[in-house]
Amino acid sequence: MPLQGPQRRLLGSLNSTLPATPYLGLTTNQTEPPCLEVSIPDGLFLSLGLVSLVENVLVVTAIAKNRNLHSPMYYFICCLAVSDLLVSMSNVLEMAILLLLEAGVLATQASVLQQLDNIIDVLICGSMVSSLCFLGSIAVDRYISIFYALRYHSIMMLPRVWRAIVAIWVVSVLSSTLFIAYYNHTAVLLCLVTFFVAMLVLMAVLYVHMLARACQHARGIARLHKRQHPIHQGFGLKGAATLTILLGVFFLCWGPFFLHLSLLILCPQHPTCGCVFKNFKLFLTLILCSAIVDPLIYAFRSQELRKTLQEVLLCSW
């Protein structure tokens, strides 16, 4: 990845595939509409990264401390927190280095900066891939716990879970290394976009099926109590709201980034696509928001984990 000065984000591998065209600026041609670029202040970006960092460290600490949380589901949640932690840490580190370079506080050789650039890019890309994998793993774990409840412990045996976790981390590191090494190949971007779509479809199918089963179970209970409509409708609305939050957060936070990659494949030099490319930092900010929201959705809803977290915070004082 050729360095283009300190103004370039270190995560240039995926963004630098965009050819240098006049479409990246505000269009000067009166026949073309001006581009809308959402400016993300560096302070806000760093603040979101630090909040996510602290939040996910607390999740990992709570799960590690409480042996009651040493189960397959919480292991996946813990790994998701580690992935989100790495996403936040790498983005904060990248931004801090850029700010130091721009301020002239940090001076280093171009070759050293190039190596640091590659390492951070691999770290960011690998943590993104692992985050998506563990989001899918949590969905699969919940699906098995509902549809194969009697066989859950025989299916989700700890050795098997640990092998799956190790495999996810290994694949994430290897794939991110290949992605960064061959970032200028269309096949790399296509693989990333396909992977995101596959995870989105997997989560949507599993969670919708779980919601349908839960509503069916609620109808059966309602018929027994002869209160079919109030119970079923209330439960269905609550379940639909939960499903909307789960998939909505996933799509809104991750979708724009992968839309960016898709447009790099489809229309790298089109002026409209160029307007989208200008908001690359916004898309990374949304991924940081996902790293903040994930613990709220998957971890902090557990009463046991909240209790452990409270003990950890009290002990720290």
UniProtKB/Swiss-Prot annotation:
<feature type="transmembrane region" description="Helical; Name=2">
    <location>
        <begin position="73"/>
        <end position="93"/>
    </location>
</feature>
<feature type="transmembrane region" description="Helical; Name=7">
    <location>
        <begin position="280"/>
        <end position="300"/>
    </location>
</feature>
<feature type="topological domain" description="Cytoplasmic">
    <location>
        <begin position="301"/>
        <end position="317"/>
    </location>
</feature>
<comment type="similarity">
    <text>Belongs to the G-protein coupled receptor 1 family.</text>
</comment>
<dbReference type="GO" id="GO:0031625">
    <property type="term" value="F:ubiquitin protein ligase binding"/>
</dbReference>
<feature type="transmembrane region" description="Helical; Name=1">
    <location>
        <begin position="38"/>
        <end position="63"/>
    </location>
</feature>
<dbReference type="GO" id="GO:0005886">
    <property type="term" value="C:plasma membrane"/>
</dbReference>
<keyword id="KW-0297">G-protein coupled receptor</keyword>
<feature type="transmembrane region" description="Helical; Name=5">
    <location>
        <begin position="192"/>
        <end position="211"/>
    </location>
</feature>
<feature type="topological domain" description="Cytoplasmic">
    <location>
        <begin position="141"/>
        <end position="163"/>
    </location>
</feature>
<feature type="lipid moiety-binding region" description="S-palmitoyl cysteine">
    <location>
        <position position="315"/>
    </location>
</feature>
<dbReference type="GO" id="GO:0004980">
    <property type="term" value="F:melanocyte-stimulating hormone receptor activity"/>
</dbReference>
<dbReference type="Pfam" id="PF00001">
    <property type="entry name" value="7tm_1"/>
</dbReference>
<feature type="topological domain" description="Cytoplasmic">
    <location>
        <begin position="64"/>
        <end position="72"/>
    </location>
</feature>
<dbReference type="InterPro" id="IPR001671">
    <property type="entry name" value="Melcrt_ACTH_rcpt"/>
</dbReference>
<keyword id="KW-0472">Membrane</keyword>
<dbReference type="InterPro" id="IPR000276">
    <property type="entry name" value="GPCR_Rhodpsn"/>
</dbReference>
<keyword id="KW-1133">Transmembrane helix</keyword>
<protein>
    <recommendedName>
        <fullName>Melanocyte-stimulating hormone receptor</fullName>
    </recommendedName>
</protein>
<dbReference type="GO" id="GO:0032720">
    <property type="term" value="P:negative regulation of tumor necrosis factor production"/>
</dbReference>
<feature type="topological domain" description="Extracellular">
    <location>
        <begin position="184"/>
        <end position="191"/>
    </location>
</feature>
<keyword id="KW-0564">Palmitate</keyword>
<dbReference type="InterPro" id="IPR000761">
    <property type="entry name" value="MSH_rcpt"/>
</dbReference>
<feature type="transmembrane region" description="Helical; Name=4">
    <location>
        <begin position="164"/>
        <end position="183"/>
    </location>
</feature>
<keyword id="KW-0812">Transmembrane</keyword>
<dbReference type="GO" id="GO:0005737">
    <property type="term" value="C:cytoplasm"/>
</dbReference>
<dbReference type="GO" id="GO:0045944">
    <property type="term" value="P:positive regulation of transcription by RNA polymerase II"/>
</dbReference>
<dbReference type="GO" id="GO:0141163">
    <property type="term" value="P:positive regulation of cAMP/PKA signal transduction"/>
</dbReference>
<feature type="topological domain" description="Extracellular">
    <location>
        <begin position="267"/>
        <end position="279"/>
    </location>
</feature>
<feature type="transmembrane region" description="Helical; Name=3">
    <location>
        <begin position="119"/>
        <end position="140"/>
    </location>
</feature>
<comment type="function">
    <text>Receptor for MSH (alpha, beta and gamma) and ACTH. The activity of this receptor is mediated by G proteins which activate adenylate cyclase. Mediates melanogenesis, the production of eumelanin (black/brown) and phaeomelanin (red/yellow), via regulation of cAMP signaling in melanocytes.</text>
</comment>
<feature type="topological domain" description="Extracellular">
    <location>
        <begin position="94"/>
        <end position="118"/>
    </location>
</feature>
<dbReference type="GO" id="GO:0007189">
    <property type="term" value="P:adenylate cyclase-activating G protein-coupled receptor signaling pathway"/>
</dbReference>
<keyword id="KW-0325">Glycoprotein</keyword>
<comment type="subunit">
    <text>Interacts with MGRN1, but does not undergo MGRN1-mediated ubiquitination; this interaction competes with GNAS-binding and thus inhibits agonist-induced cAMP production. Interacts with OPN3; the interaction results in a decrease in MC1R-mediated cAMP signaling and ultimately a decrease in melanin production in melanocytes.</text>
</comment>
<keyword id="KW-0675">Receptor</keyword>
<feature type="topological domain" description="Extracellular">
    <location>
        <begin position="1"/>
        <end position="37"/>
    </location>
</feature>
<dbReference type="GO" id="GO:0019233">
    <property type="term" value="P:sensory perception of pain"/>
</dbReference>
<feature type="transmembrane region" description="Helical; Name=6">
    <location>
        <begin position="241"/>
        <end position="266"/>
    </location>
</feature>
<dbReference type="GO" id="GO:0035556">
    <property type="term" value="P:intracellular signal transduction"/>
</dbReference>
<dbReference type="GO" id="GO:0019222">
    <property type="term" value="P:regulation of metabolic process"/>
</dbReference>
<dbReference type="GO" id="GO:0070914">
    <property type="term" value="P:UV-damage excision repair"/>
</dbReference>
